[in-house]
């Protein structure tokens, strides 16, 4: 069956909130992992099929732009493992992910649920998006960045 794994950093001052979330998500189908190592995160990506990214959801990009993901390295990391990203449609991740090509965008929670269900019910489509996600992630490799930076500098 499917599992939801929430993984990310948690500052000490947010521990009470984390405990509250763990209490609400008290089910065997949800794992909440805080402050895990890079190796552990890599293992999660290698086992995952779908990657949700929701930074900025419920916020205003006008009044609180800092609450949005500016780039989205975790999205690229997931894509490099062939995981299909389903990202909130505002901010950096929505520029990385080309909806319907190498992942999906969502605006409301209903969209997130519907798109997740579509991926689950059509594994061949999900596989295709995952393959394209790997290709797209290659655009963000350090070596490629260095080459583009040198090309830019040489134009001056």
Where are these regions (language model features)?
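Glycosyltransferase donor-sugar binding loop
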Residues: 3-19, 34
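Nucleotide-activated donor-binding/catalytic signature segment of Leloir-type glycosyltransferases, i.e.
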Residues: 18-43
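Short glycine/proline-enriched, acidic/aromatic patches that form the donor-sugar handling elements
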Residues: 41-42, 59-62, 91-96
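Acidic donor-binding loop of glycosyltransferase active sites
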Residues: 46-70, 83
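Flexible glycine-rich beta->alpha loop in the catalytic core of nucleotide-sugar glycosyltransferases
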Residues: 56-58, 84, 91-92, 102, ...
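Short hydrophobic beta-strand element within catalytic cores of glycosyltransferases
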Residues: 75-80, 84-87
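Conserved acidic donor-binding segment of nucleotide-sugar-dependent glycosyltransferases
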Residues: 89, 98-110, 117-124
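A charged, aromatic-enriched C-terminal amphipathic alpha-helix characteristic of glycosyltransferases
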Residues: 107, 111, 124-155
């Amino acid at each position: 069956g499917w599992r939801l794994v929430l993984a990310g950093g948690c500052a000490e001052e947010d521990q009470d909130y984390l405990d509250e979330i763990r209490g609400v998500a008290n089910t065997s189908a949800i794992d909440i992992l805080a402050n895990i190592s890079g190796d552990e995160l890599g293992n999660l990506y290698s086992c995952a099929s779908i990657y949700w990214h929701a930074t900025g959801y419920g916020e205003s990009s006008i009044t609180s732009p800092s609450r949005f993901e500016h780039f989205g390295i975790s999205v690229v990391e997931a894509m490099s493992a062939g995981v299909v990203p389903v990202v909130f449609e505002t901010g950096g991740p929505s520029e990385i992910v080309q909806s319907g090509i190498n992942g999906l965008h969502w605006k409301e929670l209903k969209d997130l649920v519907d798109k997740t269900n579509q991926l689950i019910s059509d594994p061949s489509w999900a596989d295709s998006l995952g393959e394209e996600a790997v290709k797209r992630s290659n655009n963000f490799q350090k070596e490629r960045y260095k080459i583009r930076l040198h090309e830019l500098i040489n134009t001056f």
